[in-house]
Regions:
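PLP-dependent class I/II
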Residues: 1-185
């Protein structure tokens, strides 16, 4: 898929917010940028930011962000290859271990969206069962009512953690299916 920056389409009534935090794992720097081409809009935003006490980032954060953008290409290429391997690994594991589950294809993210509605549990039960088996996901309802029966899976981790997490999820789901088959709640 081709990325089209919004600022390449128009300079009017638009702004762009960006940060190196997700891409380069620099959230601790608490540094972001706002690109506002329209001078009048930029002036209004600057006035409100000053009123709110928002200042530019500290020198360490500015330099860390600059270094990531200027020198981080090789590291980022390696990360992207690793995450692509994790995505493929998760896809294969879900297909093999959780045949009733549906993994939404991941595009431009390291977060998988796993549909477990076929197992007949709501998010509260899913979370209780997965925690009992020592694995935690983000429950789908965190993102709204439409997320009921879904879990979010983070693949930005060592591959062995994905394997372990899916195996524990399988144990939790198998246990639930077994209990329901025997009339145990």
């Amino acid at each position: 898929e081709q990325f089209v920056p919004v600022l390449s389409l128009t300079q009017k009534n638009v702004l762009s917010l960006c940060a190196a935090s997700k891409t380069f794992n620099l959230a601790g720097l608490e540094q972001a940028a706002m690109l506002v081409p329209d001078e009048a809009v930029r002036a209004k935003i600057n006035t409100e930011m000053e009123r709110a006490g928002v200042r530019s980032g500290n020198l360490f954060a500015l330099e860390g962000t600059r270094a990531a953008y200027e020198y981080g290409d090789a590291w980022l290429d390696g990360l992207m290859r690793y995450l692509d391997g994790n995505r493929k690994h998760l896809t294969a594991l879900v297909k093999q271990e959780l045949p009733q589950a549906v993994l939404t294809p991941m595009e431009a993210t390291y977060l998988g969206w796993l549909d477990l509605r076929a197992y007949g549990m709501n998010c509260e039960e899913l979370m209780a069962r997965t925690l009992k088996h020592g694995v935690q996901f983000t429950e789908g309802t965190f993102f709204g009512e439409g997320g009921e029966g879904f879990l979010r899976v983070n693949i930005g981790c060592p591959r062995r953690n994905i394997t372990e997490g899916i195996h524990r999820l399988k144990e939790a789901l198998d246990e639930a299916v077994e209990e329901k088959a025997h009339g145990v709640d």
